[in-house]
Each structure stands twice: as C-alpha cells, then as structure tokens.
C-alpha cells in the first residue's frame, strides 16, 4: 500500500483506534439532532460509536438502556416502542460525554428517494398554492438531504470529484 498523506492518516487513525480502543469518544450519525423524528410503535434501535469498553446509557420517556462499546467502538441499544408524541428528550451518555436531543418527535417516518421527481416542489404543482395554504401541521418535520452536486449532463470539476472521493454526497442539513 502506497497511500498519499491523507490515506496514511486514515490508516494511522484506524490502526490507533484498533490498538488503543480510542475512537474519539461518543459519536452519533448526523440524523441524531434536536427536532428529529423516531418511528412510532416499533422498537427503537439507537446506535453509535464510543471508545472500546465505554458504557453508553440511553434514555427517553422514562426508559433507560445501556450497552458497552465493542472492540471496534460500536454500541447499540434497543428501547421499547413509544407512542406518538412531539416533545421527547433523548439523552445519550458515555462517561463524562453527554448528548441531549430536545423536541424529539415520535411518529411516522417516511424515506423518499429519487432524482427529478424528488426535486419537484409543491408550489410547482397545478394545485400547489391551494395545497400549501391548507398545510397546517406544526409537527411536520423534514430532513432534506440535498445532493452536494447537480447531476445534470455537465462535466464535474476536480473539486466535485474530490468531495465524492471523500464520500461527501450530500450537503449538511438538520431537521
């Protein structure tokens, strides 16, 4: 293997974590934020990364579950299903590190995917103005993962290809 400086850094970080068990402490997917939505009426699988051997405790709505991070730093807990609600607090703690997510909703989670059909905006529809005026749901939440680059028939510059090489497909977003 003859990596460049960046590749050597990735290899070093991976080997360091494997040898020491230090994976940078408590880490979660970008989906875990204030105002996020969890699926109702199904067991809740909460997972992330912590240092090897760290006990991670997760609590929400009076429930609490713990797990120990394995030798790759991975941990996962499963909590009992929750009913629909809009003001839960999800707390995740590993040692002195604590992450608290407020205004968590429990309800229906829909995953939508596509290309041009997903780029179509409601205000472009024939009945869009009427539909928008009737849309009055303060508990509706959207996690819109927009692509980092346009996918039309255009040549991509080197900066675009570099970001794709680094698995940066989407723009940063929140709920």
Please describe what each predicted stretch is:
Residues 24-175:
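Cell-envelope and extracellular/periplasmic
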């Amino acid at each position: 293997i003859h990596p460049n400086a960046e590749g050597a850094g990735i290899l070093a970080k991976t080997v360091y974590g494997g040898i020491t068990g230090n994976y940078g402490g408590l880490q979660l997917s970008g989906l875990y934020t204030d105002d996020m939505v969890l699926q109702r009426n199904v067991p809740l699988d909460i997972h992330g990364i912590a240092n090897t051997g760290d006990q991670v405790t997760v609590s929400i709505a009076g429930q609490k579950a713990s797990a120990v991070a394995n030798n790759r730093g991975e941990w996962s807990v499963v909590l009992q299903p929750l009913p629909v609600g809009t003001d839960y607090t999800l707390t995740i703690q590993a040692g002195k590190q604590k992450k608290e997510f407020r205004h968590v909703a429990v309800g229906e989670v829909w995953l939508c995917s596509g290309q041009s059909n997903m780029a179509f905006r409601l205000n472009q529809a024939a009945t869009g103005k009427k539909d928008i005026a009737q849309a009055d749901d303060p508990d509706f939440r959207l996690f819109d993962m927009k692509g980092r680059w346009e996918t039309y028939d255009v040549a991509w510059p080197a900066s675009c290809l570099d970001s794709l090489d680094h698995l940066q497909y989407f723009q940063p977003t929140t709920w």
